[in-house]
Amino acid sequence: QSKLKNSTPVQKSKLKKRLSPLRYPGGKSKLIDQLLPYIQDKECFVEAFCGGSSLGLALLDAGKIHKLVLNDLDRNVYAFWKIVCSNQYKELNDKILEYSPIKETYFAYQERLKSSDLSDLDRAFYFLVINRCSFSGIQMANPKSDMKDRWIPKSLTERIKKIHSMSDYIEVRNNDAMELIEEMYWNPKNCIFIDPPYIEKGDQLYPVKFHLHQELAELITDLLREFPGCADLLLTYDDQEILHQLYNQNH
């Protein structure tokens, strides 16, 4: 990511960079123009760690791909996208229009998300409230003092309605990322976007922990070395020395 930001300026595309209603630490909306040249002539874009999915949604909306796979092991993220792509999106939008954020409900929703008994609809709504009203969209964070500035019902519901209009071309999954990568790799018409949690601060930012950076590096390099010519793999990371070691030793 750091290298992309510091690279030679690229021509701005007409892709919509703000389709997602989610705010995400490490989101790639600002890097869409830099990433676009690496995604050409592919039918399906697979997001192994989808999060807010700003890149995948922009590609689908622009007709650059014909199918989008949104995968996230975080059950809150999964429930949100599942509801947005189902007929229950209308009920979610009703909840959004009726809600006015206050700290009391923020903390109550944050606590309820820990329960395994929530319906997908409630989980999706609570998650959206926390995501929009917390610092940087971090699920475990405290609410921002200006919560209402981030909660704009009309804008949120319009984005959700827009995404739902593309739902025939979206598949939502709740799989282990490395299992999904291995499954999707064999189709040369796929581009698999691998954007794992930050190495340095991932535990502070995401409720679902991911410590398998070495195993991920081994999987990626093994697939590319032993079985070239299959899906394209697009990998983004925070620039850490350990990454250079992992990918150099596995090259």
Predicted segments with their positions:
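A cross-domain feature marking catalytic cores of carbohydrate-active enzymes
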Residues: 49, 196, 237
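Short, electropositive alpha-helical surface patch
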Residues: 242-251
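Conserved beta-strand signature within the Rossmann-like core of class I S-adenosyl-L-methionine
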Residues: 230-236
